[in-house]
Amino acid sequence: MNEEKKVKYGEIYFYDFGEHEGSIQNGLRPAVVIQDNKLNGHGPTTIIAAITSVTKKLYLPSHILIGEQFGLTKPSMILLEQVACVNQKDLGNFVGAINNEKIKRAIRCGLKKTFGLWDYAPRGDADVRCLCPKCLQDYIHSNKYIVKRLDPFAA
């Protein structure tokens, strides 16, 4: 990457994440810039999130499906739990840029949930519960509860 150019939020570049054990993303893969443009413009580093073509666990708020667009050649998903601070000059070839406001909003919302910045406080006296897909089935088919919203993480 040209050292003079500053990256922007939502841009996708190839980045070599190196070799790791376990579930940490490895190797050369696309990554999206998730750091604010003001910070990108004032420093040599940025924060990126890995992108994978293995689209699973879509119910997690940290997994943002972006499909086969923005320069990507396969249906892909952003992994907001797989972030790294990197030198801007170490980013590889430019792939594309996320220009869809709904996806950008989903990324911001997912980052808040991933880093524990989301307020889950119930409003009023209502009994508010956040359920995994498996537990949700018990509530949907019960006469004791009223399920008002099935997807509280929808952007």
Feature map (PLM): residue ranges:
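Short, charge-rich amphipathic segments
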Residues: 3-6, 34-50, 113-116, 134-137
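Compact nucleic-acid interaction/catalytic patches
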Residues: 23-28, 33-68
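Short, charged beta-turn/beta-strand-edge "cap" motif at the junction between a beta-strand
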Residues: 18-22
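C-terminal terminal-subdomain/extension
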Residues: 4-5, 69-129, 133, 137-155
